[in-house]
Regions:
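Phosphate-binding loop of NTP-binding sites
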Residues: 1-142, 146-157
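Beta-strand->loop->alpha-helix junctions that form or flank phosphate-binding loops
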Residues: 18-23, 155-175
Length: 175
């Protein structure tokens, strides 16, 4: 945990603690389809993985579900990785780039890890779009008031695909 004395000493020395996803991402050129949100991550990740596999794509399932991304990159590499990302994993990502970032929603969760500060948790979730370029895609729930507020703070380079419950101006898709 981030509060462990050894981890604190390492961080105090300016050394980054990186997530397993950050580590593995350094050793592959595969396309990364990353899903985060407070709710619905596992279901969405599983459905996308299923669609990729049924369509005949070489895809691996990683993150909070499936096998370790690092293990797959080393021993069973895939052209695509469908990755469920928790806020914990996003916290320790610096150079990793999601080719497709999907942000489902942001609601209060795990606030004890974030000094009971909702904005700290929100900032962690928004890290999914860091390092994206104009060649990438960002899909997000346009009905979430927190996401809408946060988007105003970012210079998003990825092509945006907002979706909503009802057909509305500005949304690409609706359910």
């Amino acid at each position: 945990p981030d509060t462990a004395p050894m981890i604190r000493k390492i961080v105090e020395k300016g050394i980054h603690i990186i997530s397993e996803i950050e580590f593995a991402g350094r050793y592959t050129d595969s396309k990364m389809i990353c899903i985060t949100g407070s709710n619905g991550k596992t279901t969405t990740t599983s459905l996308i993985y299923h669609i990729f596999k049924e369509a005949g794509y070489d895809a691996g399932l990683a993150g909070n579900i499936g096998n370790s991304l690092a293990l797959q990159v080393a021993e069973d590499p895939h052209e695509y990785y469908i990755i469920e990302l928790s806020s914990f994993q996003l916290d320790n990502m610096y150079d990793f780039r999601a080719n497709i970032a999907i942000l489902l929603n942001i609601t209060p969760d795990h606030l004890d890890r974030y000094d009971n500060c909702m904005q700290n948790y929100v900032d962690a979730k928004m890290r999914i779009i860091q390092n994206q370029t104009d060649k990438d895609a960002f899909i997000y729930w346009n009905d979430d008031p927190i996401i809408k507020r946060e988007l105003e703070k970012y210079d998003i380079k990825a092509v945006q695909y907002p979706f909503s419950e009802l057909k509305e101006k500005g949304s690409i898709g609706y359910i």
